[in-house]
Amino acid sequence: MATVGTEEKNPIGSASNTAEPNVTEPQKQYASGFKLTIIVISLCLSLFLCGLDQTIITTAVPIITNDFKAIEDVGWYTTAYLLTTSSFQIAYGKLYTTLSVKMILLMALAIFELGSIICAAAPNSTTLIVGRAIAGLGAAGIFPGSTLVLVHAAPMERRPALLGITTGMFGIASLCGPFIGGAFADGASWRWCFIINVPLGVITAVIVTFFVFTPVDPLYAEWTFKDKLAYAKIPEILVLVAALVCLVLGLQWGGTTYAWSDGRIIALLVVFAVLTTAFLVLQVLLPKSRTIPTSIVKNRNIWFASIFALCSSGAMFIAVTYLPIYFQAIKNASALSSGVNVMPLILGFLVMSIISGVITNTTGYYNPSMFLCTILASVGAGLVSTFDVGTPQPKWIGYQALLGFGIGFGLQQPIVCAQHVLDERDVPFGVAFINMMQMLGGAIFVAVSQNVFLNGLANGIAEALPGFNTHKIIEGGLTDFKNLFTSDQLPKAIPVYAHVLGQVFLIATGLCVGTLLGSLGVQWRSVKKAKVTEDQADVERK
């Protein structure tokens, strides 16, 4: 069985000077029956936790911005979470490779719980953003960890269907999230959106502790803990994190808080370019500092799958962030009602994520689901961008459902692709890389959407209401902005708000169209053939 290159296997210290042990791999033993059921339940709980945390806040954001008077932070509550989630995917992938998957997963759950507690107690918007970033750091390990437990527990031919179930549970959480978040925001407090994570996280940790077993790869058994930690390349990851923070700050502040020509915006974008260049130089010139394994860098399927993941996930996060705003600000819905109104999107995603797993399991190919995603999501997002003040219920239900169907077909396929085209020892890196691109798509394009939203709103109001002080809009909340206008001004302001949201959804449309590049680039390879190869390898070991 091929392994990653030498530069990725030997970090520093004693392990790097020790010859690789001659390890005879035992026949792979997979879980079945009751044990496999318990494992799948634990994975469903962990992904339910993450899925709930991603969407439960969406319907509460307008009320949060009203409380903190921070409409300019509307995107940060999502971006901060996704930024840390995406940036540390590869670091977690390396930790999962050399250390116990179970141990790292429990650590990630603990970090996630800490972030949730900080969010629940946040006295201001800045503290809430910090808490979201910490929770995202924990979620970064939960996503790949749950998938890798499944890799250890189930044979290849069963993984697509089981992955469909676990992804479906993520979808169920996503479905429940807006409804639960809206109920908390209207009835009790938006802080309960984060308090609820504590008991759910504890239950998940208990099940993982007592029922999940993931052996450490014998290839790394002789490595010291210091060597294993060095292998994660944390300093290099921090360079990437700093670069992404500069990019996001530049994209969110440019044209709103500061002019694009302002020295601070220029400095942020220049620092982003310098740090990104430094990160790439480390990857090319210093093999021992390489964060992304050579086997992944040279694999075209991973790169095209990553493009697909970046675009599809970016579109999904834009939709779940701004659709509740549309319903609350334009349709005068309560937080709870807006959660109900976005259910066509989430339910469509849920249903098709499960069906796509069955299709892949039946046909042996993940490519058809990727093309269906491109077609349906592009049409659905384009129709959603036409939402205005008078859009009737049948249209906003059907258009959302179509978008959800499309994204549901494709969102899990890049992960299935990574599991299929990579050697088993490279799967942790591949899954982590795909997850990183998914979260990065949300972080970047939600930031872009916030910029378009705030700029468009300020410029649109200035044009519709000459002489109006647009700075009042930035200093207010998402829904109480209506109190800024007189009864004569409001009929002119609301259509501007709706038009700007339509521009935001056009960004999602462009991303859905962009998934076509990934769909075309991924090679057609049968998952069923992988099963035959796996069986032959088991026979040879015997």
Curated annotation (Swiss-Prot):
The keyword Transmembrane applies. Glycans are attached at N22, N124, N332, N361. Residues 1-10 have a biased composition (Basic and acidic residues). MFS efflux transporter probably involved in thioclapurine export. Keywords: Cell membrane, Glycoprotein, Membrane, Transmembrane, Transmembrane helix, Transport. SUPFAM superfamilies: MFS general substrate transporter. The chain crosses the membrane at residues 32-52, 75-97, 103-123, 133-153, 161-181, 193-213, 234-254, 265-285, 307-327, 339-359, 370-390, 396-416, 427-447, 500-520. Induction: Expression is positively regulated by the thioclapurine cluster-specific transcription factor tcpZ. This is MFS thioclapurine efflux transporter tcpA. It holds the Pfam family MFS_1. It comes from Claviceps purpurea (strain 20.1). The keyword Protease does not apply. PROSITE patterns: MFS. InterPro entries: MFS, MFS_dom, MFS_trans_sf. GO terms for molecular function: transmembrane transporter activity. It is found in: Cell membrane. Disulfide bonds: none annotated. Residues 13-24 have a biased composition (Polar residues). Its main location: membrane. One of its GO terms (cellular component) is plasma membrane. Residues 1-24 are annotated as: Disordered. It is a multi-pass membrane protein. Belongs to the major facilitator superfamily. The gene is tcpA.
